[in-house]
Amino acid sequence: MLKVAIVGKPNVGKSTLFNRIIKVNKSIVDDKPGITRDRIYANAEWLTQHFKLIDTGGLMLDEFDFKKQIELQVNYAITEADVIVFLVSYKEGINNDDHYVAKILKKHKNKKILLAVNKSETRNKDSYDDHEYLRFGFQKPYFISANHGIGIGDLLDAIVDTKLKEIKEEDTFKFCIIGRPNVGKSSLVNCILNEDRMITSNIANTTRDAIDSNFKKDNLLYTIIDTAGIRRKGKIQENVDKYAYLRVEQSISRSNLIVIVLDGSEEFNEQDEVIAGLAHKANIPSIIVVNKWDIVKEKDEKTMNKFIKTIRIKFKFLSWTPIVFLSAIENKRINTLFNEIKSIRENLNLKFNSKILTDLVFKLQMLNSPPLFNRGRIKINHVTQVDGQIPTFVLFCNNPEYLHFSYARYLENEIRKSLGLNNVPITLYFKNKTDKIRGKKNDK
């Protein structure tokens, strides 16, 4: 797939252009320099042509926190991209930072570079000011307004004009990484991807955007989503943190799996419980990762079991969730995490024959009969699997409205155990035996 990077100094509108092209607010936009500090990826389309769009941190000459790391991110993006959109601002004019960016881009002569002059909504169309931008040496400029949508079509025409061999998209398994600030989420992403894709530091909340990264492992395609650290709501003061909190919820909503990262070197706190609650609410598989295991003090053969016991008590609503101990910074026990991810992926794709399911539930009813109600006893006489993000089963019975939640929980736990679905949640729907059901899988 064609890859397109948007590059420029801070505050020229890179994230606004990125959002305009992909038509959603994926990158956090604000007036503060460097608010987009990692490179953000998204799929985009123009005139039936698909391409991958990359937003980057801004390059600038002045001394500035994260300057060197942002420059490294931009260089990664430039190396990776087939087309580079060099964005400058008509409103602010050209300065040394723009020439600095141009100097870097000229080193990449094999790349297609498109100069886009943003914030040009006030420009007179009859003005002859192209020469100021032609000095950069990148053919004719495209005058646009990302905020107002002016000139975007012409720029996109030039982007998709680049010819590349089509690569067939494969099914990808998406998992997001969530946790409070500074528990090592970005270090874990870098460890998995074997590159400094994310800006990492010991300053809490270095990562503010949700960032998608595609990679292959064992011939399977994955998408990993790293998110901003979740603070307690009372501490969410800046707009940026509010946006990031919403982005975490959005990331969860488009994931197949949630990786909850805890800091093993500190006591688990209320924030960790709130984050685990988000995972529970989503009702999709999750894995609890205890990171920084390398710096946990006074470990012995019982330490891990003590941690597991504490986690099971604190997060009792995630009793089925696997727990993995690792050190992202030391690249230790990462394979343990991937073994769990692969197992969950396989379990989510399992399909079960209706006869097997019905026989299983009959046996469970024989072992533990449904409780009586004023009209008699409930009897489940048929079970089938239907489409769902997690294994979803419909149980047909008489008077389902009288089924007690404790018996439903008994069935859920026993079905999960009997079918080997110990590391994923399942959903049970109880329907009247006369109801029709949609989305039923064909039995094999």
Swiss-Prot record:
Pfam families from the entry? KH_dom-like, MMR_HSR1
Q: Which organism is it from?
A: Malacoplasma penetrans (strain HF-2)
Q: Where is the KH-like domain?
A: 350-434
> Is the keyword Cytoplasm in the record?
no
Function text: GTPase that plays an essential role in the late steps of ribosome biogenesis.
Superkingdom, taxonomy of origin: Bacteria
Q: Which SUPFAM superfamilies match?
A: P-loop containing nucleoside triphosphate hydrolases
EngA-type G domain location:
2-167, 173-349
Family the UniProt entry places it in: Belongs to the TRAFAC class TrmE-Era-EngA-EngB-Septin-like GTPase superfamily. EngA (Der) GTPase family.
Q: Tell me one GO biological process term.
A: ribosome biogenesis
Q: Which InterPro entries match?
A: G_ENGA, GTP-bd, GTPase_Der, KH_dom-like, KH_dom-like_a/b, P-loop_NTPase, Small_GTP-bd
Residues bound to GTP 2 are 179-186, 226-230, 291-294
Assembly and interaction partners = Associates with the 50S ribosomal subunit.
One molecular function GO term is: ribosome binding
| Keyword hit for rRNA-binding | no
For this entry, the protein name equals: GTPase Der
| Assigned keywords, A-Z | GTP-binding, Nucleotide-binding, Repeat, Ribosome biogenesis
Binding site residues for GTP 1: 8-15, 55-59, 118-121
